[in-house]
Structures are given as structure tokens and as C-alpha cells.
Amino acid sequence: GGPMYYLETGLRQRNLSWLAKPMGLFYAMSIVVGCLGIGNMFQSNQAFQQFVFITGGDASFFVDKGWLFGFILAGIVALVIIGGIKGIARVTSKLVPFMTLTYVIGALLVVILNAHKVPWAISAILTEAFNPSAMSGGMLGIMILGFQRAAFSNEAGIGSAAIAHATVKTKEPVSEGFVGLMEPFIDTVVICTLTALVILTTVYEPAMANEGIQGIALTSQAFSSTLSWSVLPLSFIAILFAFSTILSWSYYGSKGWTYIIGESIWAESFFKISFCFFIALGCMINLSAVLDFSDALIFITAIPNIFGLYVLAPVIKSELVNYQKRLHSGEIQHYRSSPD
């Protein structure tokens, strides 16, 4: 499942057969290349930066040994993805709830301890976003940057999550769509807002004075400035976040790859080996290069999917209306009453 399949099938149903297969292939090729950026090199790079931070920073033994960390991480990932979607699901289903809950609790604790700065932080977000200078000169640039980082945060519009949701066994695809709608809310509205408040109420001013603070290092310093003991737990969670994201994107990329050349154990093995190589590569290059590469790949991946969303919008609306009618009529029973 995923965009390459619903683009091909959906466009045929919309009498656009001549465009169906090319758009499916366009998306498949985009997700194969795109998974190497946002879901691979960027994640391994940030995991390595966090590992260096907790092992001494610039004085760390590993500061110039990204290759070593990269190959170790690639080896661990390889052990999991060899098991396919079941192995990936087994690991991520245990990691993600634990990581999310722990991170939210830690962020709330930092915000509460700096509660006196929260009104200023919220005011700064609103005033800096909508002041006249921002809306004139820098508005377009900031909007572009915002869209790029939002895509990193929740993958909305990219279509990657649809590949994972397609593996779910359900008789009602619409209900699975509702589950998918919760993901951007949790990622962006909850997690990212909390992270922004943590940074703004702790290390915002020093970070602005030193342009070298960016990425995961900025968040780490924000937490450690209030909770000195949080460095190791947060670093562990950040590395696990990167690890689980890499696992998920390995599956997305493999499905795009097999869509292009067909299902076979050799095809999947070749992709998995190549994917693991890029994990190591991501640890060896600087963050700005990874970000530029990833931003370009996100844009390319989103093009065919967003096109498909607009073209197939009437189909989605029809399915939603039909689902709501059956739900309200009682035809769809979500819960069974237990016998007395």
C-alpha cells in the first residue's frame, strides 16, 4: 500500500489512466531517494551529535569518529529490518509510547519550573511571527523554513505514513484515516510546542547569540539548563527517536523500491544494505549538508502525493460520507457489549 498504489489505482478510476503508472513510479522513486534524507542520514546525524554531546562534546573520543558510531548504528538497524515489517513493528510499538511519554513529562517539568517565562515565550512566538518586519522582508523565507521543519516533524503531505497504515488489517479504511490525522497533532501541536516553550524559557537568548547552537544540541542544552540530571535520559530518548524513525523509513523506502522492480528477497536485501550504508554516511557529514539534502528530497516526495490528494479528493469525500452514514445508522459497530 501507500501513495504509489493509490495514485495508480485512483487515477485510473478518475479516467486518468495515462497518468496512473507514471505518477505511481514518480512517487516510488521519490520515496526511495527521499528515505535516505529525512528518515536516514538526518536521523543518524542527530543521534551521533547527541552521543558526542553526552560523551564530552568537543573533547569526546568520538567527535571525529562518526564512521564508528555510524557503522554500529547501521549494524543494529540491520538486525531489526531483516525481520521485515513485523520486526520493525515489534520494536517501534514498544519504544515510541515510552519515548513520547518520557519526553512530554520532562518537557512539562522544565516549562513548569520556568512558568514565569511562559507568558513572554508565547508573546514572543506571536509577536515575532506577525510583526511588520517579519511580514514584509522575511515572511516568505520563514514560511519556507517553517514548512520544511513541519514536514520533518509530522511528514504531513509526504504520504509516507500511508505506507505504514496500509499494513493495518481493517474493514474501514476511513477509521484508519482518522487515526492518521492524530499523528500531526501529537507531533506538532503537542511535542513541537512543548519543545519550543522549553527552548524559549531556557536558552533562547544564548542560542541567538551563538549561531553554532542548533539541532538536537539546542534542545539538549535547554533541558540541561534546568534539569542537570536530564542530559543522559534525554540523550538516550533522542537516540531512540532517531533509531525508531530510521526503522520506519527503511520500510517506506523498501516498499517504493519493490514497487519499481518487483518483490523479491534479492531486491529487498540490496535496498536494506544500501540503506544501512547511508546511515553510516549521515554520521560523517555536517548537519547543514544533511539538511539541504533532506529538504530537497522532501519537496520532491511531496509533489506526486499532494497532486494525488487534490485529484482524489472527491473519492475521499464520498468514502467519508458513506462511512458517516453507516456509523450513524448503527450499521458499523465499534464496540460489542459484554454479556451479563
Placement of each model-derived feature along the sequence:
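Membrane-interface loop-to-helix entry segments
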Residues: M23, Y27, I31, S44-F51, ...
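Helix-loop junctions at the membrane interface of multi-pass solute transporters
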Residues: V80, V111, A150-E155, G159-P173, ...
